[in-house]
């Protein structure tokens, strides 16, 4: 009798048993919506975008009932439901993130749940990454003026000799970061200006192999997405390099807008061919594709140097034709970005870096161009340099110097030219030079006006002759006599023993630019280039040296 009772109780217990605990099988659960080929040198082979990833999961039940219905949970949210007997599932994932995945098995008596396993789905919005926080370095101080644009250029090649990766950029103090530079594919006759830099033309041809001319690409895939850097150094990290760090840094700085700058001094040649609508269409479509692939970007900056010519390639330039092409190009880019906004729900900016030379401003109808542009980055620097040993002057200045009141290459003259064309002052962003330009062997000057003399060539530079980083100027300041021209709002240093003369932006001159921007209700300031600063100049842009109400 007792035996029969125990047998009945055992049958009841079995019939009322919830499923056994599922154990998820081991597997590599790192996925990417944009796959990177780490062996590739050509952009066409570098990336493989996907609309979704298929996350495969299988499980076993080592003891007990296998259940009737199985569920797969991501962070406790159901993402799949099916027959428990299959012991496997495929989940289609369309977004990035790190998810705790569990399997839940159920029957009429209840459910059991597995231990979690981590699923990592990477995408170029960086949703799979931990935020890359900035550690305050050198003289940088926290504090950003939120009422003005505060932007800076970061260069792709800065990770090499300059040893200045993204994690060294004081991003909390910037509203915009401009990534220099994104190239446009094309070989002989299309990118000839690039041949002036040893190896750079050849590097672009490797990256553009198999890619149609006039499509954008990445110039240096190793620096951009393959080089291990802080926060993106794991062997299985899908996006390393500058791009990977920018994705992570943006998570820590959600206010930040990052724009790829297309063109630049030696990469502007292809723009001169875009009077051809077919070439222009190829370019615009490729920019759209680029933004769809690299989701951390917030728009595009066009740095055509320069419509009308007088750029790195003296054989290119047609003032009337380029002026029309520039307007058309901006209109078509803006229309493309509008379509992309409608598709994604995001906001995409279109900006342009332009020369501050009055003669180059006169080529373009900026009143018309501004209809497509959110901001105009006025490159108010490189006015003078060691390309001339007889025409010495301020390489960056707000006003004309007292010793040359007829000087037209000034920030004020450029701003005034744009305002007279009808450009919205709030769209004008004034440039700060985080470097100096200079001469050596300066002689034959009069009345201690060193700029009235003649030079004997470019002075010793930080990375190239005649160009000195602000950081180095500040470090070597005791070797010079420093002068601030308060009338022009410009700075320079001079070493009489060597005749070394450097014109540069100092804290004094940058504060002068800040006042000028505020007084004229301009949109803000930007800098070329952030790796050359020790923090002094960016602090000055953000008005750290004086309260805002004293400006």
Curated annotation (Swiss-Prot):
Annotated InterPro entries: Chitinase_II/V-like_cat (IPR011583), Chitinase_insertion_sf (IPR029070), ChitinaseA_N (IPR013540), Glyco_hydro18_cat (IPR001223), Glyco_hydro_18_chit_AS (IPR001579), Glycoside_hydrolase_SF (IPR017853), Glycosyl_Hydrlase_18 (IPR050314), Ig-like_fold (IPR013783)
Species, as recorded: Autographa californica nuclear polyhedrosis virus (AcMNPV)
Organism classification: Viruses, Viruses incertae sedis, Naldaviricetes, Lefavirales, Baculoviridae
GO cellular component: host cell endoplasmic reticulum lumen
Domain GH18: 148-548
Known function: Plays a role in host liquefaction to facilitate horizontal transmission of the virus by hydrolyzing beta-chitin and by regulating the cysteine protease VCATH. Localized in the host reticulum endoplasmic via its KDEL motif, interacts with and thus prevents VCATH secretion before host cell lysis occurs.
Predominant place of localization: host cell
Residues the record marks as carrying a glycan: 173, 444
The organism's place on the tree of life at top rank: Viruses
GO molecular function: chitin binding; endochitinase activity
Protein name from the UniProt record: Chitinase
């Amino acid at each position: 009798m007792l035996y029969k009772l125990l047998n009945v109780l055992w049958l009841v217990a079995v019939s009322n048993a919830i499923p056994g605990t599922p154990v998820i099988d081991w597997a590599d659960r790192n996925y990417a919506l944009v796959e990177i080929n780490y062996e590739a040198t050509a952009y066409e082979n570098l990336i493989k975008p996907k609309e979704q990833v298929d996350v495969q999961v299988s499980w076993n039940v080592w003891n007990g009932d296998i259940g009737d219905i199985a569920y797969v949970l991501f962070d406790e949210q159901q993402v799949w439901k099916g027959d428990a007997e299959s012991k496997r599932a495929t989940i289609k994932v369309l977004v990035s993130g790190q998810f705790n995945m569990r399997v839940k098995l159920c029957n009429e008596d209840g459910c059991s749940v597995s231990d979690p396993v981590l699923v990592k789905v990477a995408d170029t919005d960086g949703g799979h990454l931990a935020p890359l926080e900035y550690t305050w370095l050198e003289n940088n101080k926290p504090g950003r003026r939120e009422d003005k644009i505060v932007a800076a250029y970061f260069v792709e090649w800065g990770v090499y000799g300059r040893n200045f990766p993204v994690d060294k950029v004081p991003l909390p103090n910037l509203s915009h970061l401009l990534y220099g530079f994104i190239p446009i594919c094309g070989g002989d006759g299309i990118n000839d200006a690039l041949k002036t830099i040893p190896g750079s033309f050849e590097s672009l041809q490797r990256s553009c192999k198999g890619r149609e001319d006039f499509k954008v690409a990445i110039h240096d895939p190793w620096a951009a997405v393959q080089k291990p850097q802080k926060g993106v150094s794991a062997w299985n990290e899908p996006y390393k390099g500058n791009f990977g760090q920018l994705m992570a840094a943006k998570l820590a700085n959600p206010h930040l807008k990052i724009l790829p700058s297309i063109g630049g001094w030696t990469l502007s040649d292809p723009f001169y061919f875009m009077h051809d609508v077919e070439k222009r269409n190829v370019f615009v479509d490729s920019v759209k594709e680029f933004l769809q692939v690299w989701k951390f970007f917030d728009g595009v900056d066009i740095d055509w140097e320069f419509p009308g010519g007088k750029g790195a390639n003296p054989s290119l330039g047609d003032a009337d034709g380029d002026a029309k092409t520039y307007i058309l190009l901006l209109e078509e880019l803006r229309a493309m970005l509008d379509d992309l906004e409608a598709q994604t729900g995001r906001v995409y900016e279109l900006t342009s870096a332009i020369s501050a030379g009055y003669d180059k401003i006169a080529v373009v109808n900026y009143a018309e161009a501004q209809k497509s542009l959110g901001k105009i980055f006025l490159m108010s620097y490189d006015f003078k340099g060691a390309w001339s040993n007889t025409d010495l002057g301020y390489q960056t200045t707000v006003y004309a110097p007292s010793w040359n009141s007829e000087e037209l290459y000034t920030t004020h003259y450029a701003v005034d030219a744009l305002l007279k064309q009808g450009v919205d002052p709030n769209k004008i962003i004034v440039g700060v030079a985080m470097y100096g330009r200079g001469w050596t062997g300066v002689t034959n000057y009069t009345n201690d006006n060193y700029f009235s003399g003649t030079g004997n060539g470019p002075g010793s530079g930080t990375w190239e002759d005649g160009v000195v980083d602000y950081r180095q100027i500040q470090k070597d300041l005791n070797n010079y006599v420093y002068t601030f021209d308060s009338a022009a709002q410009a700075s320079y240093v001079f070493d009489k023993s060597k005749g070394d003369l450097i014109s540069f932006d100092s804290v004094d001159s940058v504060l002068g630019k800040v006042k000028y921007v505020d007084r004229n209700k301009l949109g803000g300031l930007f800098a070329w280039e952030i790796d050359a600063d020790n923090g002094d100049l960016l602090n000055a842009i953000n008005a750290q040296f004086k309260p805002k109400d004293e400006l």
